[in-house]
A protein has these predicted regions:
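Short beta-strands within extracellular/lumenal beta-sheet-rich domains
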Residues: 57-74, 116-121, 149
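Extended extracellular/luminal ectodomain segments enriched in beta-structured repeat modules
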Residues: 73-81, 128
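Extracellular glycan-recognition surfaces and repeat-rich motifs
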Residues: 20-51
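Short beta-strand-plus-loop segments that form exposed binding edges in beta-rich domains
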Residues: 133-142
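Extracellular carbohydrate recognition and processing domains
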Residues: 103-126
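Short, surface-exposed beta-strand/strand-loop-strand elements in extracellular ectodomains
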Residues: 94-103
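A short, hydrophobic C-terminal helix/tail in secreted or cell-surface proteins
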Residues: 158-176
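Sec/Tat signal peptide C-region and signal peptidase I cleavage site
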Residues: 14-18
């Protein structure tokens, strides 16, 4: 086996397209997510997983802004899609919901919309990107926002990519063994 063959095998393995996992399972099981409050007392309910999760924003009475985040790491490059069903007690301007991508917040709720909103959101990730969901509270007063996220799908590595990398590793180990003997 030559260096060129190894390079071609590695290139083929790394250029494989991603598969898609549907629901909060496998690489996107709730155990692989991180929950964070910053000046907020929100919470996440994963009892509906893998079909859905629910995120509830802060209302700690501080009068200051805060965030409730639920984030994970992209297992492969591809598209993340999810449906969301949102409600708030004090108006969407005060408690917007959206998604995070590498720390940047993209709001999906409409500040001028009703206290009940829903939709579908889609964005692209690269392997290793941090992404997730956020409820931002401007004031931590007058009630919380809640969102249920369902029909979640996200990219995972193709099984053939993993298999190719394992084969490549085995070939490399075999060559090293043969070279010694």
């Amino acid at each position: 086996m030559t260096v060129t063959t190894v390079s071609l095998t590695l290139a083929a393995a790394s250029s494989s397209s991603a598969a898609t996992v549907f629901g909060f399972q496998d690489a996107y099981d709730p155990i692989n997510w991180t929950f964070t409050n910053s000046n907020a007392d929100g919470f996440v309910n994963t009892g509906g997983a893998p079909a859905s999760i629910s995120l509830t924003g802060g209302n700690n009475g501080s009068g200051g802004s805060g965030t409730t985040d639920y984030t994970t790491t992209a297992a492969a490059a591809g598209t993340v899609t999810f449906d969301w069903n949102y409600s708030t007690a004090d108006g969407p301007f005060w408690d917007p919901f959206g998604y995070l991508l590498n720390g940047s917040f993209t709001q999906v709720t409409n500040n001028g919309g009703g206290v009940f909103q829903n939709g579908t959101s889609t964005f692209n990730v690269l392997a290793g990107d941090s992404f997730g969901f956020r409820i931002f509270t401007r004031d931590n007063l007058f009630g919380r926002a809640r969102v249920t996220i369902s029909n979640f799908s996200a990219p995972i590595p193709e099984p053939s990519t993993v298999l190719s990398l394992l084969v490549l590793g085995g070939l490399g180990a075999g060559l090293k063994y043969l070279k010694r003997n």
